[in-house]
């Protein structure tokens, strides 16, 4: 009498054949799992001889959880690098907007027009008479110079912190209108708010029935907001209407801007001396922020003659020849 055929199973959890007869419950006697499948001898032989690639088993995340964690760590590292790139891009965009805003303020007052002096060889910035050298305090770097320094390196590279520090420590009146006269500030009327409007300084609403200071342009602000503002600026924060301003400088005293543009000796990093067009460390004058983000202009800044950039540097009188 022929023997009854033995039913064979394949355990998908421990990936081995099961030949023992199971009566009560079909499960793997080795691992106790119930994920078993009845198969023919050919199918079991094929599965037995198969060599799965490491990391591609369907149970690999369960059998080797550490590998999944490593993969997650790599994904997290990539995510952090991407977030860092986004943050740097946002900081650059924010800096650009700040500089553009400063440029707009300076453009409103022709008497306070400023300029940047860029040394394309030793990577130093001269802003309104102050020399900012990114390599200052870092010791001797072998005396080498960078002939390919671009303006972006000053703004977004080593000179970024120096530029921000200069802007933060500068006199606020240089970056806008001068302070308003105390008499003009004291003469501002205090009005009663009849409809809800927004204070443009703190962006909070002026409640109906409350008291507020009104500028001659009829813009209204909290007293605690507009009075400190007028101690630094004489213009309206909304429309830039100007009140009479305090004159804090002697008209006969030359300004820092004049010294920067009229004298190379005061801004040269290598000290006083005769300055000639054949100097191996030339300065090029670039209008304040107009060419700040122009790669081509910054790259060629070292080869531009200063007397072609500004009539002040060459000592030429722009009104010469006119009676």
UniProtKB/Swiss-Prot annotation:
Location of region: Disordered: 248-280, 296-323
Fetch the Gene3D superfamilies from UniProt. Zinc/RING finger domain, C3HC4 (zinc finger) (3.30.40.10)
Which keywords has UniProt assigned to this entry? Cytoplasm, Metal-binding, Stress response, Transferase, Ubl conjugation pathway, Zinc, Zinc-finger
Specify residue ranges for compositional bias: Basic and acidic residues: 259-269
CDD domains reported for this sequence: RING-H2_RNF181
Q: Which SMART domains match?
A: RING
What name does the UniProt record give this protein? Answer: E3 ubiquitin-protein ligase SIRP1
Query: What is the source species?
Result: Oryza sativa subsp. japonica
């Amino acid at each position: 009498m022929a023997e009854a055929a033995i039913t064979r199973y394949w355990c998908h959890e421990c990936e081995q054949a099961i030949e023992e007869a199971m009566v009560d419950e079909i499960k793997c006697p080795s691992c106790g799992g119930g994920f078993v499948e009845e198969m023919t001898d050919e199918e079991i032989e094929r599965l037995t001889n198969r060599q799965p690639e490491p990391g591609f088993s369907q149970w690999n995340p369960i059998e080797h959880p550490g590998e999944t964690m490593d993969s997650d760590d790599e994904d997290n590292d990539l995510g952090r690098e991407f977030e860092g790139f986004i943050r740097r891009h946002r900081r650059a965009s924010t800096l650009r907007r700040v500089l553009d805003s400063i440029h707009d303020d300076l453009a409103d007052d022709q008497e306070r027009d400023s300029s940047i002096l860029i040394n394309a060889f030793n990577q130093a910035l001269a802003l309104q008479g102050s020399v900012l050298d990114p390599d200052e305090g870092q010791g001797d770097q072998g005396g080498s110079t960078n002939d390919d320094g671009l303006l972006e390196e000053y703004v977004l590279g080593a000179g970024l912190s120096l530029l921000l520090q200069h802007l933060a420590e500068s006199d606020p009146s240089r970056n806008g209108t001068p302070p308003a006269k105390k008499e003009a500030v004291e003469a501002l009327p205090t009005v009663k708010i009849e409809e809800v409007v927004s204070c443009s300084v703190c962006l909070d609403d002026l409640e109906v029935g409350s008291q507020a200071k009104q500028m001659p342009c009829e813009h209204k602000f909290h007293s605690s907001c507009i009075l400190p503002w007028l101690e630094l600026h004489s213009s309206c924060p909304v429309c830039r209407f100007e009140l009479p301003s305090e004159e804090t400088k002697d008209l006969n005293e030359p300004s820092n801007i004049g010294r920067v543009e009229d004298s190379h000796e005061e801004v040269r990093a290598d000290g006083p001396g005769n300055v000639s067009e054949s100097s191996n460390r030339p300065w090029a004058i670039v209008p304040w922020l107009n060419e700040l983000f122009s790669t081509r202009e910054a790259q060629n800044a070292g080869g531009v003659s200063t007397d072609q950039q500004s009539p002040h540097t060459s000592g030429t009188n722009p009104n010469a020849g006119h009676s």
